[in-house]
UniProtKB/Swiss-Prot annotation:
This is Chorismate synthase. The keyword Manganese does not apply. It comes from Psychrobacter cryohalolentis (strain ATCC BAA-1226 / DSM 17306 / VKM B-2378 / K5). SUPFAM superfamilies: Chorismate synthase, AroC. Pathway: Metabolic intermediate biosynthesis; chorismate biosynthesis; chorismate from D-erythrose 4-phosphate and phosphoenolpyruvate: step 7/7. NADP(+) binds at residue 48.
Length: 367
């Protein structure tokens, strides 16, 4: 039924709409004793929040999160953690003209056909506004993974429209620079090209897609539950649940179709793997190498160029989208994708620990 939850041991359930009173999350399965404050969650929320850059939507939300349960005297209690973010900058009047029409490329038509009714204000539940709660919940997972396991999750944008970043080797990425520019890009030259492209998109009344990579380093060997809950399957599921994502690749992804077995099989030596074409996952189980995930996001359909559609009477119309929108939704997607990867990894770690905590590995890990 309703798909508002993710995870089996570490679970996240969210609710809330773009123009509702606020957003809520229940985060369950967090081990007790983790030092946690609202400031810990706010770091990633500030990276995602709208209105912080001229290259994203101009809707301004503080996205200040409140922890309403599950934390006492600065530590998690082991009970469910309740999170709340209040909406403060809705402009629902921007959407009054479209309540009887379907915006092309949006979920308006499918939500209406599925439920027989929809919240037309900013897309309601289908809006990317709901991802704020994913980021808040994911920040909890990221903190646990880093502090207890040494797992670090970081992302960077590799493409916006027809412009590409030339810095793709994770060992050479300056992560401080990535987090200091509005595009989460590792290539200083590409940042200026991205700026020029976004400015031109605004003038032309259109938008573009994007591609980004998320890397998890320090992941222990053994995470993943074959066969239906393979780690890469659950990662792909989590990434595809993000608004506008139309493609997910693990490791070399689609490029493996043009490779040969003798060069793509990630050979092993006592000193470690010789390559990482598989993206840190073999047989659906983490190998201990970096987990590399790439996602592609489509151009936002909310643009100021008129397009064909229909209204609720089934009549042909031409409509122009109004409101405040991102010319490229990929600009703010990096912390969202990081959060989703963290949620999946913590869930799988806790599942693995529950079943295999006393397993003695037959050989020493080579990573």
């Amino acid at each position: 039924m309703a798909g508002n939850s993710i995870g089996q041991v570490f679970t996240v359930t969210t609710c809330g709409e773009s123009h509702g009173a606020g957003l809520l999350a229940i985060v369950d399965g967090v081990p007790p004793g983790l030092a946690l404050s609202e400031a810990d969650l706010q770091i990633d929320l500030d990276r995602r929040k709208p209105g912080t850059s001229k290259y994203s939507t101009q809707r301004r939300e503080s996205d200040e999160v409140e922890i309403i349960s599950g934390v006492f005297e600065g530590k998690t209690t082991g009970t469910s953690i309740g999170l709340l973010i209040r909406n403060t900058n809705q402009k629902s009047k921007d959407y009054g003209e479209i309540k009887d029409t379907f915006r092309p490329g949006h979920a308006d038509y499918t939500y209406s056909m599925k439920y027989g009714f929809r919240d037309y204000r900013g897309g309601g539940r289908s809006s990317a506004r709901e991802t704020a709660m994913r980021v808040a919940a994911g920040a909890i997972a990221k903190k646990y993974l880093l502090e207890r396991l040494g797992v670090q999750i970081r992302g960077h944008v590799t493409q916006i429209g027809h412009e590409y970043s030339d810095v793709l080797n994770s060992s050479t990425i300056d992560w401080d620079f990535v987090n200091s520019n509005p595009f989460f890009c590792a290539d200083a030259d590409a940042v200026s090209r991205f700026e020029t492209l976004i400015d031109s998109l605004r003038r032309e009344g259109t938008s573009c897609g994007a591609r980004l990579e998320i890397i998890a380093s320090g992941v222990p060997v053994g995470l993943g539950e074959p066969v239906f809950d393979r780690l890469d399957a659950d990662i792909a599921h989590a990434m595809m649940s993000i608004n506008a994502v139309k493609g997910v690749e693990i490791g070399d992804g689609m490029a493996v179709a043009g490779q040969f077995g003798h060069s793509s099989r990630d050979e092993m030596t006592p000193d470690g793997f010789t390559a990482n074409h598989a993206g840190g996952i073999l047989g659906g189980i983490s190998s201990g190498q970096d987990i590399r995930v790439s996602i592609a996001l489509k151009p936002t359909s909310s643009i100021t160029t008129a397009g064909k559609s229909i209204n609720t009477e089934g009549e042909a119309i031409e409509m122009l989208t109004k409101g405040r929108h991102d010319p490229c939704v990929g600009v703010r997607a990096t912390p969202i994708a990081e959060a989703m990867l963290a949620i999946v990894l913590l869930d799988h770690y806790l599942r693995h620990r529950g079943q295999n905590a006393d397993i003695k590995q037959p050989v020493q890990s080579i990573t």
